[in-house]
Curated annotation (Swiss-Prot):
Gene3D superfamilies recorded: Aldolase class I
Species this protein is from: Salmonella typhimurium (strain LT2 / SGSC1412 / ATCC 700720)
This protein's record includes keyword Thylakoid: no
InterPro entries noted in UniProt: Aldolase_TIM, RibuloseP-bd_barrel, Trp_synthase_alpha_AS, Trp_synthase_suA
Keyword match Lyase: yes
Name of this protein: Tryptophan synthase alpha chain
Pfam families xrefs: Trp_syntA
């Protein structure tokens, strides 16, 4: 959890927001996936949000569903994902690493065992996409036992009770949704979210990162101007992977230029 605190403190001093890319571990295969992650970091990613392939990703649109399918087609298992995470952590000791999971994968070998494994490989946070705040107690308690930040989603229509719960239970960062629905770059994130960000700050929530539909540098700078601590982009990044499956080098080059432009916008 300290990695998030250190990151946000450093960014604050430099008056920048965080740019956080999302990819699915093992898409399109383990070797290329590790190269993709190195490229994202080298190009300026401040933290990583990583998915573990899952057969029924309810919160995700077609782009990220296809990423899951490609990882499955490559035979990627959760056990291999944890091996990848250990390698990433060894190579990049300071970057915050977050997992975006679904409850079934957490339940598989028992909730406590899952978070213990996360701690072992150097994961900093876990967001369980299909567990609402009011059902989150066993997850967040196990997370905190193992020094993992439990991440909660704050939807654009959050009422005061939900804002207070998210602020109270969340650690690391708060995932602020630009809009309702599923992920996807084609559904552009609607701003402004000033009022939610102000309330979250008032209730001492973990810093808000805006996600869902973030696909352009303008949206990153708008999120930072609205008071968010940064932005998360998933589908736009995964589309670059999808578009360049036949040319892995071109894929990495395009990812590098996209991430560096998005990171530059966080300094606005």
């Amino acid at each position: 959890m300290e990695r998030y605190e250190n990151l946000f403190a450093q960014l604050n001093d430099r008056r920048e927001g965080a740019f956080v890319p999302f990819v699915t571990l093992g898409d399109p295969g383990i070797e290329q996936s590790l190269k993709i992650i190195d490229t994202l970091i080298d190009a300026g990613a401040d933290a990583l949000e990583l998915g573990v392939p899952f057969s029924d990703p309810l919160a995700d649109g077609p782009t990220i569903q296809n990423a899951n399918l490609r990882a499955f087609a490559a035979g990627v298992t959760p056990a291999q994902c944890f091996e990848m995470l250990a390698l990433i952590r060894e190579k990049h000791p300071t970057i915050p690493i977050g997992l975006l999971m679904y409850a079934n994968l957490v339940f598989n070998n028992g909730i406590d065992a899952f978070y213990a494994r996360c701690e072992q490989v150097g994961v900093d946070s876990v967001l369980v996409a299909d567990v609402p705040v009011e059902e989150s107690a066993p997850f967040r308690q196990a997370a905190l036992r193992h020094n993992i930040a439990p991440i909660f989603i704050c939807p654009p229509n959050a009422d005061d009770d939900l804002l207070r719960q998210v602020a109270s239970y969340g650690r690391g960062y708060t995932y602020l949704l630009s809009r309702s629905g599923v992920t996807g770059a084609e559904n552009r994130g609607a701003l402004p979210l000033h009022h939610l960000i102000e309330k979250l700050k008032e209730y001492h929530a973990a810093p808000a990162l805006q996600g869902f539909g973030i696909s352009s540098p303008e949206q990153v700078s708008a999120a930072v101007r609205a008071g968010a601590a940064g932005a998360i982009s998933g589908s736009a990044i995964v589309k670059i992977i999808e578009k360049n499956l036949a040319s892995p080098k071109q894929m990495l080059a395009e990812l590098r230029s996209f991430v560096s432009a998005m990171k530059a916008a966080s300094r606005a």
